[in-house]
Every structure is written in C-alpha cells, then in structure tokens.
C-alpha cells in the first residue's frame, strides 16, 4: 500500500501528457527531441518533490547522447547546478517569476 507521500510524488499520466505538450516534446535543457521523456522531477522525489506539472520537466534519457536527466540526477555538483539553473529559468519563463522550488515539496 502506497503512503500519501508516495502517491503525491508519483507522476500521473495526465501530468506527463501536459508536460510533454508544454515542453514541445523536447528536452528543456538541450533542446533535443529524440529519446526524451516528460518524467524528471525538478525537486527530487527523495526530497518530497511532487508529481505535479510545475515540478516535472522533459529531459533526455540515457539513450540520448546528452543524457541530461542522468546528469541532473547523478552528475557532478557543477553539472547539477548548471542544469538546475537552466530548468529554473525555463520554468519561470512559463509560470512567471513567482515559480519557486520550495512550492514543489510535499507537505503533510
């Protein structure tokens, strides 16, 4: 049985579809459109990142040479910071400057 937090951090198919359209079927970091998926939490699930449209972006999978999702999750500190800055700028361009990472966290 899933906990409330686990359910809240899952990404429903409806959210993936909205994100896929919002991101124009492309990685929001490098712009590639092959081997990309709308399933990357900006604030990670481990940190309570919600599975909502404002916390999910489309990034390259490991099949894409750029591997943006892998670098964002497992890269060097510098890679993670650079990718986060690009994602943050993108999200603010979509949702306005009121978009904040702190609003993407699960709250009890």
Model-derived segments and spans:
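The −1 position to Zn-ligating cysteines in a subset of zinc-ribbon hairpins
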Residues: 26, 38, 59
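Short Cys/His-centered divalent metal-binding micro-motifs
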Residues: 32-35, 56-86
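Processing junctions and N-termini across compartments
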Residues: 21-24, 54
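A boundary/linker detector
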Residues: 1-17, 24, 31-36, 81-108
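Short linker/helix segments within small regulatory modules
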Residues: 43-56
